[in-house]
């Protein structure tokens, strides 16, 4: 697999787009757009990204003209990216920006909800299976690789008798511990790399 899909490269090459801020890293929050989904479990990636933007005292996310995405500079060399598509098509907003900036998957940090972790737990990894997460599936398809970094925020499995789609669209508090810990994990990834960040976060 290549780091960015052929289709995304073609889109980045021929679509008329203004310059993006120079960046070496992308920090991607996964979720669904719109007030209906704003506070749901499936949107903890958005919540974490918002927390990071506030903590770094950066400008709010704004539309990136010519892309299906919102962006803002999170720190020097770090661009926060949020697809304006629904979760299942997240890669369509992210991959063309990665292609335009020449950013490999190894420097794309994706923050997302994780059913297979207890609520509040955070785990970091590079690559691996998408575990049925449609946002990750879209990113993998559009980037052409699984080798992006993942900040996984535990939301637990639904109780017996409750369907997963209903469960992930239930509301949660924006200040739950997993979101804050995930924001810390992103900062550690950027500053110290994956191994050091895992050592610091996985013991908590």
Swiss-Prot record:
Catalytic activity: an N-acyl-L-alpha-aminoacyl-tRNA + H2O = an N-acyl-L-amino acid + a tRNA + H(+)
Residue(s) at site: Stabilizes the basic form of H active site to accept a proton: 113
Localization per record: Cytoplasm
Principal place of residence: cytoplasm
Transmembrane segments: none
Record-listed tRNA binding positions: 37, 86, 88, 134
GO molecular function: peptidyl-tRNA hydrolase activity; tRNA binding
Active site residues according to the UniProt entry: 42
Gene3D superfamilies in alphabetical order: Peptidyl-tRNA hydrolase
Site annotation Discriminates between blocked and unblocked aminoacyl-tRNA: residues: 32
SUPFAM superfamilies: Peptidyl-tRNA hydrolase-like
GO biological process: protein quality control for misfolded or incompletely synthesized proteins; rescue of stalled ribosome
Family per similarity comment: Belongs to the PTH family.
Protein task: Hydrolyzes ribosome-free peptidyl-tRNAs (with 1 or more amino acids incorporated), which drop off the ribosome during protein synthesis, or as a result of ribosome stalling.
Protein name: Peptidyl-tRNA hydrolase 2
């Amino acid at each position: 697999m290549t780091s960015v899909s052929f289709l995304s490269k073609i889109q980045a090459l021929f679509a008329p787009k203004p310059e993006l801020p120079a960046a070496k890293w992308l920090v991607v929050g996964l979720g669904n757009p719109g007030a209906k989904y704003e506070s749901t479990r499936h949107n903890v990636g958005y919540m974490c990204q918002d927390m990071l933007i506030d903590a770094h005292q950066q400008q709010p996310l704004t539309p990136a003209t010519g892309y299906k995405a919102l962006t803002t500079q999170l720190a020097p060399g770090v661009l926060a990216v949020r697809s304006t598509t629904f979760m299942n098509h997240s890669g369509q907003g992210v991959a063309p920006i990665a292609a335009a900036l020449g950013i490999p998957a190894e420097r794309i940090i994706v923050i997302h909800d994780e059913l297979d972790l207890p609520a509040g737990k955070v785990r970091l990894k590079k690559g691996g299976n998408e575990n049925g997460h449609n946002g990750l599936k879209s990113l993998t398809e559009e980037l052409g690789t699984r080798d992006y970094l993942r900040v996984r925020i535990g939301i637990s499995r639904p109780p017996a008798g409750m369907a997963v789609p209903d469960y992930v669209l239930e509301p949660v508090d924006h200040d739950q511990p997993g979101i804050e810990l995930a924001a810390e994990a992103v900062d550690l990834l950027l500053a110290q790399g994956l191994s050091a960040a895992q050592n610091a976060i996985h013991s908590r």
